[in-house]
Amino acid sequence: MEFYKAVCAKYKVKINSHVVEVLQRTTATENVTLTITGNHRLRPVQRLDDDDIRMLVQCLQIKQGLTGLDLKFNNITDEGVIYLAELLQKENSSLSCLDLMFNDILTDGAKILCSSLQGNRTLLSLRLSGNKIGNKGGMHLAKMLQENDTLQELELADCDLGIQSIIALIISMKSHKTLHRVDLSRPLLFSHLEEWAVHCTDMLVVNCIMVELHLAKMGMTDTGMQRLAEGLRLNRSLRYLDVRCNRVTRDGIRYLAEVLKQNPTLEIIDLSSNRIEGEGAKYLSEAITCPGCSVKELSVTRNNIKAEGLLALTQAMTANKTLTHIYVWGNHKDEPVCKAFRDLLSSGRLLPQHTDVSAYEVDGHIYLAEVFNALRRHYRTDSSGTNDTYNSLLGDRLKPTAST
């Protein structure tokens, strides 16, 4: 902390009180993760700008044992990325996780990051979601993936990626040997041909590393789901599939349900905010009751599912004990549905923390109230966000590669 103040004084940069506070709290000397985010829930904090990053990097250059740097929700621009690149290029760098989500990084910043990562052997996780790097920035990242063979997690949601960069990234994923978690949600796709789905299918057929794939807000239709299902049928590594906020209806779900009957690896599926309706829920229910289905957690919130479809899902839970988490809020909650979920909860078949509804009775009638539980956003944490099942699954693959 004192060194940080001295550096600020040397370069005549105003001291950032938030940085000082975090450095004061950091006493560990090994496996250090610095969390300097700009979105504190309880009180306002001074967000970091490029000058703050320059001063911080000056301090971190001499600090050993830094493995994580969480800088999301700040005001870092392409200029700040130049300083962070110096940290990544440091000869004895131990930084394995870098979170820059929701800053002000654009195409040039993405290019600088990619240049620094081409020779980097320690960074395992890069989160850039919410930075408008655009189509060209996505192309730089796709090129980087062809040369970097150590990165394991890449988040690029809400980055304004175009169809060219989406396809280029998916093609790079076909041959990448370590990348097992990718988020490409909400690109800017103006084509309705869903070419990306064809390439994604080809990638899933040959990729035996991918564990978690986020494809939310892709504009996916039933045709896209049909193509995706072709790849899922032959894939044996994917555990988590996120296709929320798309345009999938009962016809698309039918293709997915056929895959689930045979796929022994898919455990978590997010179908929130689609339009599968009652027929789609029935297709899912049939798949869940099959012995070959391995789905443990399912979200179908806001899908216009009426009583018959929801009852089919509750019956599937009774028949198959594999499914332990289900999220259904935002659908039609007729009283038979309310009673069915009350029975699941009261019998212990469905735990209260594993669903987003709670039953209550008024004047002899059963109703459901919303409970603020939701499907976990990452495979590596359980529904409480504490149990690192992802690490235990991947074992040594999550350990940093030694610097060369």
Language-model regions: role of each:
Residues 1-404:
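Leucine-rich tandem repeat or coiled-coil scaffolds
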